[in-house]
Amino acid sequence: MTTLPTKSKYVIIGAGIHGLSTAWHLAAQGETDVVVLDKTGIGAGASGIACGVVRNNYFQPAMRRLMAHSVEVWESDPEAFSYHPVGYMQISPAVMEKDITQIYEEQRAIGYESELIEGAGDCDNYMKKIFSDWRARGVTSVLHEKRGGFANNQASLEGLAKKAKAAGANIVCGVTVTAFVKDKSGTVVSVQTDKGEVSCEQVIIAAGPWVKSFWDMLQLPAKVASGANMWRYWALEEGVLDVPPTFLTRDDGSLPPVIHIDSDTPLCDENGKEITDKMWGIYYKPDFHFNGVQGGAAPYEVLRPVNEVKIDPYGPKSPEFIVGEDFARMWCSALSFCHGRFEGMLKKFRHEPSGGLGCFTPDSFPVFDKFCENVYIIADSNHGYKMLGVGKLVAEELRGEKSELLTPFRFSRYAEGTTHPVSNSPFPWS
């Protein structure tokens, strides 16, 4: 590992998408006295196992504006970020029509290119021009974002780390933060680790699903004004179909957009047995990094008390929070619901550990705010990987510029009652 400094103006905790992005932009703006600390390594957390989808499709106006900014950052260097700008499709039933129309209209208002197809017949025709084997029922709207797409998770993080180092930032892995030292005013003056102490002027916490641990270290409130718990965990469900990535191409042989479908049509397995008659959703894409068709479904909430949830070991190494046969059956059946080519493909599901935990806020949307005078917390509520541009905005705020894009995500919204609107999607982050 690189030597741990005894002091640094900026100490960033977490070498994932937010920590590395913040380090890069701070250093690029002339603030080179910055160190990123990670207990394991670059991309060892949620960013490193992310499916990699980059989209603007959000019902919440503040999220759309923020994501439009992040897409621009992805587009700034596709090669370094291993970014594939293939576009994104939100495919929906009638119950979501009003939401989708609103998203489309507001995307137009901010200059984000997309196309809206409405009506069951027109939607079916549109999809069959891309995939002749398209057969999903109950679809009444298709929102086709021409920008967005997906990136290869670990490759993009390595590219981001390279940019941060080239700009002058220091990245030290294998260091576990154990405590914060505060002065009498409550300002953090140093960060204690298992390898020594680092005095600092600013701390940035970009720890993904581990954010609660640092929140507790800082003795911040366990509940918000409404009485709801500040944190809760959801288990993420993703997997890979063991077929060549080219198995899922458009009829013309090119890569398709990332597909996300929500449906209220009852879903059955290949034997005709009903899986669910409630709202369901999946997303999927051909992926040469995963070497198959990769995607996922809606996560499920972990209902035990948050203090009893064990984050480590994380992701595929977890003995508990990995996908099982129920996910495989549901996801593969949903793929078959959409395309004839996936009929009978459950046997091709890749049986390997997959999954992870996301740490969610009370309203399932991020908190970007300063606490304890000089601690900036990036709590992404599992929206993180796609938000490559947040680090740029945070770096600007740390240097004294207030960000209009980050303002709707302050912690004070819970006391003020200015939380974000809720959509009809089955996904907590939509």
Segments predicted by a language model, with ranges:
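Beta1/beta-strand and adjacent pyrophosphate-binding region of the FAD-binding site
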Residues: 3-18, 35
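Conserved Rossmann-like nucleotide-cofactor binding loop
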Residues: 18, 42, 210
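Active-site substrate-recognition segment that forms the wall
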Residues: 24-28, 54, 79-87, 198, ...
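Glycine-rich FAD pyrophosphate-binding loop
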Residues: 27-47
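Dinucleotide-binding Rossmann-like beta1-alpha1 core, especially the glycine-rich loop
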Residues: 51-130, 139, 279-282
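Short beta-strand to alpha-helix junction loop
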Residues: 65-66, 91-99, 143-163, 322-330, ...
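Helical element adjacent to the flavin cofactor pocket in flavoenzyme catalytic cores
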Residues: 143-202, 206-213
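C-terminal catalytic lobe of FAD-dependent flavoproteins
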Residues: 322-430
